[in-house]
UniProtKB/Swiss-Prot annotation:
<feature type="binding site">
    <location>
        <position position="327"/>
    </location>
    <ligand>
        <name>Mg(2+) 2</name>
    </ligand>
</feature>
<keyword id="KW-0808">Transferase</keyword>
<keyword id="KW-0677">Repeat</keyword>
<comment type="pathway">
    <text>Purine metabolism; 3',5'-cyclic di-GMP biosynthesis.</text>
</comment>
<dbReference type="GO" id="GO:0005737">
    <property type="term" value="C:cytoplasm"/>
</dbReference>
<comment type="subunit">
    <text>Homodimer. Inactive monomer in solution, dimerization seems to be required for activity. Dimerization in vitro is enhanced by BeF(3-) and by 1 mM Mn(2+) or 10 mM Mg(2+).</text>
</comment>
<feature type="modified residue" description="4-aspartylphosphate">
    <location>
        <position position="53"/>
    </location>
</feature>
<feature type="binding site">
    <location>
        <position position="10"/>
    </location>
    <ligand>
        <name>Mg(2+) 1</name>
    </ligand>
</feature>
<dbReference type="InterPro" id="IPR000160">
    <property type="entry name" value="GGDEF_dom"/>
</dbReference>
<feature type="site" description="Allosteric product binding, activate and inactive state">
    <location>
        <position position="362"/>
    </location>
</feature>
<keyword id="KW-0342">GTP-binding</keyword>
<feature type="domain" description="Response regulatory 2">
    <location>
        <begin position="155"/>
        <end position="269"/>
    </location>
</feature>
<dbReference type="InterPro" id="IPR050469">
    <property type="entry name" value="Diguanylate_Cyclase"/>
</dbReference>
<feature type="binding site">
    <location>
        <position position="53"/>
    </location>
    <ligand>
        <name>Mg(2+) 1</name>
    </ligand>
</feature>
<feature type="domain" description="GGDEF">
    <location>
        <begin position="319"/>
        <end position="454"/>
    </location>
</feature>
<dbReference type="InterPro" id="IPR043128">
    <property type="entry name" value="Rev_trsase/Diguanyl_cyclase"/>
</dbReference>
<keyword id="KW-0460">Magnesium</keyword>
Length: 454
C-alpha cells in the first residue's frame, strides 16, 4: 500500500535515513528541514502522512502540528510526532497539538511501517468521507458526518490473561471509552461478534495464543473488519512481524505508554466509525438509486435491469415472465381539480395497495407519472391476468382517503397484461404489448384489465 509521506526534521542525516527506509518500501517521500517549509509543502502537496520531529529550532514540531490542524486545508492529514525515548511530556503535548500518533527514537523499522500502514489505511477512509461530504454539500445535502463521529468513545474488548496489565489498560481507557476485559479467548470471540469497536489482544498471553485468536477473528465474516491492536514486547520482533502479517491493525509496545495507547485507540475507533458510516451511507445511496422517492417502490432504472435478465432467461427456455402495465384513470383531472399534493397522496396510496396485492417474488415499480409496472417472474399470462384483476378490484373497491381525511376519492385503474413468447422476445416487445393492453382497456371505458398475447 503506497502513500505520499512528508518527512520533517532539521537534521539532514535523520531525514535521509527515513527517506531511504520509506523509499525502499515504495513510498513516495518528500522532505522539509524546518517548520515553515513543511507547512507550505503540506498545503501545496497534501501528503497522506507527515512524520514530524518534535525538536526543531525556530518552530518546533508542536507548533507545526497545531498550525496544520488549524488549517482547514491540512487538518485531515495524520501527523506522527517523532519523540525522544523518555519523551512522556512530549507525547502529552503532542496529543494536545493534534498528533495522530508517535514514534520514539531510535526508530524501529517494524514500528515505523506498522504506524505508516495503519495511518495510510485511516487516511484512505478520511479521503473517501471528505469526498462524499463535498458531494453532499454540492447537492444541498446536510454533511458534517466526520465532526459528528469524532470524539465518540467506543466499546473496547481487552483480551488478556494478565489481569494486572488488563486492568491497567482498562483504567487508562475508562475515562473516554467503555472497556471490557475477557481472559477466555472462546468467550472473547463471542463478545467480538457484538457491538465492539476495537479489540486489544495480548499477543504474548501465557494461557492462549493471541495471534491464533487474531487469526480466528480475521477468518470470521462478522469480525473480519474489526480493528485489532496487539500488545507485544518491544524486543519480540518476530511476534510483531507475525502479528502484522495475520492482520493486526497496529502494535502496542509493552510496557504500555498511556499517550500511545490513547492515540492508537482513537485512530482505530475513528477509522471503524468512518468506515461503518461510509458502508451504511453507500447502502443507503444504492437504495436511493433504485427507489422512487415518492412511492417507495423500485424505479424504472431498476425495473429495466431486472426485466432484461428475466426475459433473457425466459427466452432461453426458462419459465415465462409476465408484465402488468398500470395507468391510473383520469389522474390529470385529479391533479387539476385537487392540486399536485393530493395527486401525490393518490400515488402513494395506490403504491401501498399495489405492493400489498402482489407476491414476494414480484417486482412492483413506478414507471413514470401515473404509470406503474409489475414484473412477475415464473408467471404465465393466465395467472398474471388473475392477479391484475385482484389489483384492479382492490383499488376500485374502496375510496382513497386524502387531505387528512377531508376528501374521499374514487380511483380506478386500467391494466395491460403480457407474457414472454419464447425465443426472440425482448423486454421492449413485452412492455409494448402490455401498453397496447392499457390502450384497449381505456378505449373500452377504463377500470378494466386486458391481456395481450404475442
Amino acid at each position: 500500500m503506497s502513500a505520499r509521506i512528508l518527512v520533517v526534521d532539521d537534521i539532514e542525516a535523520n531525514v535521509r535515513l527515513l527517506e531511504a527506509k520509506l523509499t525502499a518500501e515504495y513510498y513516495e517521500v518528500s522532505t522539509a528541514m524546518d517548520g515553515p517549509t513543511a507547512l507550505a509543502m503540506a498545503a501545496r502537496d497534501l501528503p497522506d502522512i507527515i512524520l514530524l520531529d518534535v525538536m526543531m529550532p525556530g518552530m518546533d514540531g508542536f507548533t507545526v502540528c497545531r498550525k496544520l490542524k488549524d488549517d482547514p486545508t491540512t487538518r485531515h492529514i495524520p501527523v506522527v510526532l517523532i519523540t525522544a525515548l523518555d519523551g512522556r511530556g512530549d507525547r502529552i503535548q503532542g496529543l494536545e497539538s493534534g498528533a495522530s500518533d508517535f514514534l520514539t527514537k531510535p526508530i524501529d523499522d517494524v514500528m515505523l511501517f506498522a504506524r505508516v500502514r495503519s495511518l495510510t489505511r485511516f487516511k484512505l477512509v478520511i479521503d473517501e468521507l471528505r469526498q462524499r461530504e463535498a458531494s453532499g454539500r454540492r447537492m444541498g445535502v446536510i454533511a458534517g458526518a466526520a465532526a459528528r463521529l469524532d470524539g465518540l468513545g467506543g466499546r473496547v474488548l481487552i483480551v488478556d490473561d494478565n489481569e494486572r496489565q488488563a486492568q491497567r489498560v482498562a483504567a487508562e481507557l475508562g475515562v473516554e471509552h467503555r472497556p471490557v476485559i475477557e481472559s477466555d479467548p472462546e468467550k472473547a470471540k463471542i463478545s467480538a461478534g457484538g457491538p465492539v469497536d476495537l479489540v486489544i489482544v495480548n499477543a504474548a498471553a501465557k494461557n492462549f495464543d493471541g495471534l491464533r485468536f487474531t487469526a480466528a477473528l480475521r477468518s470470521e465474516e462478522r469480525t473480519r473488519q474489526l480493528p485489532v491492536l496487539a500488545m507485544v514486547d518491544p524486543d519480540d520482533r518476530g511476534r510483531m512481524v507475525k502479528a502484522l502479517e495475520i492482520g493486526v491493525n497496529d502494535i502496542l509496545s509493552r510496557p504500555i505508554d498511556p499517550q500511545e495507547l490513547s492515540a492508537r485507540v482513537k485512530t482505530q475507533i475513528q477509522r471503524k466509525r468512518y468506515t461503518d458510516y461510509l458502508r451504511n451511507n453507500l447502502d443507503h445511496s444504492l437504495e436511493l438509486a433504485v427507489t422512487d422517492q415518492l412511492t417507495g417502490l423500485h424505479n424504472r432504472r431498476y425495473m429495466t435491469g431486472q426485466l432484461d435478465s428475466l426475459v433473457k432467461r425466459a427466452t432461453l427456455g426458462g419459465d415465462p415472465v409476465s408484465a402488468l402495465l398500470i395507468d391510473i384513470d383520469f389522474f390529470k383531472k385529479i391533479n387539476d381539480t385537487f392540486g399536485h399534493d393530493i395527486g401525490d397522496e393518490v400515488l402513494r396510496e395506490f403504491a401501498l395497495r399495489l405492493a400489498s396485492n402482489v407476491r414476494a417474488i414480484d417486482l412492483p415499480c413506478r414507471y413514470g407519472g401515473e404509470e406503474f409496472v409489475v414484473i412477475m417472474p415464473d408467471t404465465a399470462l393466465a395467472d398474471a391476468l388473475r392477479i391484475a384483476e385482484r389489483i384492479r378490484m382492490h383499488v376500485s373497491g374502496s375510496p382513497f382517503t386524502v387531505a387528512h381525511g377531508r376528501e374521499m376519492l374514487n380511483v380506478t385503474i386500467s391494466i395491460g397484461v403480457s407474457a414472454t413468447a419464447g425465443e426472440g422476445d425482448t423486454p421492449e416487445a413485452l412492455l409494448k404489448r402490455a401498453d397496447e393492453g392499457v390502450y384497449q382497456a381505456k378505449a373500452s371505458g377504463r377500470n378494466a384489465v386486458v391481456g395481450k398475447a404475442a
